[in-house]
Amino acid sequence: MVKGGIIIKKWLIICFISIALGYTIIQNFLLKDKEEQKSQTENITIGTELGNVAPNFLLQTVDGKEVHLTDYKGKKILLNFWASWCGPCKIEMPDMEKFYIDMKGKGIEVIAINATASEKSPDHVKQFLQENKYTFPVLFDIQGQANATYQIMSIPTSFILDEKGIIHFKHVGPMTYENMVKYMDSL
């Protein structure tokens, strides 16, 4: 009887140690995972520098629909700041239209933010787009808030964002179709 009691005690001790060890291991993995998530969250910086998450905005399409940048999360983005009176902007727009058409359905979006505050009127911009048969999405920055947030000093200025909204490239001046493809392919 004593032998059986000793065996049971040993078995209970082994079970207790195993449970305690298993609990400790699981807790350490969960804690480590939480610390990694917290660390990743703390390292996110919103801004306009390379490696930052691009600042969100709320602007209107040419049809008056409100759009946030975050509406495009999960897609690579060519974010372009321009105006209809800007000569270099006019030079890059045919390439941007071709890029937009070629990338449709491939998880890549073109978003052209018009510096509407510097234009004659939104109707003038609509007319410019229609006359040139541009079909890529255009957003009106009527108050100039997006241009200010993104610290746009000259136009055209373009940002290349990955699917998480992180800025990988900033290009000041007109871009060619080849530039656009090269930037996107490097993501």
Predicted segments with their positions:
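N-terminal targeting signals for export/organelle localization
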Residues: M1-V53
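A short beta-strand-turn-helix
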Residues: N56-I77, I101
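Conserved redox-active cysteine motifs that mediate thiol-disulfide chemistry
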Residues: K73, F81-K98
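Active-site acidic short loop of glycosyltransferases
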Residues: K73-K75, G105, Y134-T135, I152
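Hydrophobic beta-strand anchors of alpha/beta hydrolase catalytic cores
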Residues: L78-L79, V110
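Structural microenvironment flanking redox-active thiols in thiol-disulfide oxidoreductases
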Residues: I91-N132, I142-T149
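Thiol/disulfide oxidoreductase modules built on the thioredoxin-like
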Residues: Q127-T135, F140-L187
